[in-house]
Amino acid sequence: MFKVVICDDERIIREGLKQIIPWGDYHFNTIYTAKDGVEALSLIQQHQPELVITDIRMPRKNGVDLLNDIAHLDCNVIILSSYDDFEYMKAGIQHHVLDYLLKPVDHAQLEVILGRLVRTLLEQQSQNGRSLAPCHDAFQPLLKVEYDDYYVNQIVDQIKQSYQTKVTVSDLIQHIDVSESYAMRTFKDHVGITIVDYLNRYRILQSLQLLDRHYKHYEIADKVGFSEYKMFSYHFKKYLQMAPSDYCKQAK
């Protein structure tokens, strides 16, 4: 649904952020990378991303110059820097930067920022009456990065690791030293929905990343863990109030 441009002259950093962060969990299905501000500016002008993550000190065009070039655009910016430099940070703040992170990047901290950002973006879509706004309510329970219960966090992690398989509740909690009834009750108390409901919502969320990649819908159903296409279609309509084919038409 959303797009991000990651700009850093260190390949290991930009590729690391691209691969490690679970972008699909935050509705980002298109991730572009650039090694300097010149490449980033071209990508931003061409694709109009909702988020730009950029280093400050880079060859050819640094982060502050890039910010000057995109100041007129409606995109959010996160600044990365190895330098705890107040003047550079102040320059970024003047350009309405979303946040400022020092390297090495704390991935958990970045995910907290992404969680806040996607809530704002989805709220804006809803207020603007955009056709994909139903995603806001359907996937709201998935946006929280961490819960204050160890067992709940373990179950969520297991769901994200095994949603593509025909996993059951028993499978999800087999490595957790609690009863199935306790796990189900605790999960519902903290998350507000059942484990099975969370699993199915997460599967549908992941399916959105595949709908524009020329897969057959029955192939997508299998890739996200549904044993039958009709179950995929049922849950898709349940959470998004439209069929997969209608979603594809409206997303174009």
Curated annotation (Swiss-Prot):
Q: Which GO terms describe its cellular component?
A: cytoplasm
A GO BP term, please? Answer: phosphorelay signal transduction system
Q: Which residues form the HTH araC/xylS-type domain?
A: 153-250
GO MF annotations, alphabetized: DNA-binding transcription factor activity; sequence-specific DNA binding
The record's InterPro entries line, in alphabetical order, gives:
CheY-like_superfamily (IPR011006), Homeodomain-like_sf (IPR009057), HptR (IPR051552), HTH_AraC (IPR018060), Sig_transdc_resp-reg_receiver (IPR001789)
User: Does the UniProt entry include the keyword DNA-binding?
Assistant: yes
Q: Does the keyword DNA-binding apply?
A: yes
Any coiled-coil regions, as ranges: none
Extract the Pfam families matched here: HTH_18 (PF12833), Response_reg (PF00072)
Modification note: Phosphorylated by HptS.
Which domain of life does the UniProt lineage start with? Bacteria
Q: Which residues form the Response regulatory domain?
A: 3-118
Q: Any idea which UniProt keywords this protein has?
A: Cytoplasm, DNA-binding, Phosphoprotein, Transcription, Transcription regulation, Two-component regulatory system
Where is this protein found?
Answer: Cytoplasm
Q: Which residues carry this modification: 4-aspartylphosphate?
A: D55
Query: DNA-binding region at which residues?
Result: 170-191, 217-240
**Task performed by this protein:** Member of the two-component regulatory system HptS/HptR that regulates genes involved in hexose phosphate transport system in response to changes in extracellular phosphate sources. Activates uhpT expression to facilitate glucose-6-phosphate/G6P utilization by directly binding to its promoter. Antagonizes CcpA-dependent transcription of a subset of CcpA-regulated genes involved in antibiotic susceptibility.
Q: What is this protein called?
A: Transcriptional regulatory protein HptR
Source organism of this protein record? Staphylococcus aureus (strain bovine RF122 / ET3-1)
Q: Which gene encodes it?
A: hptR
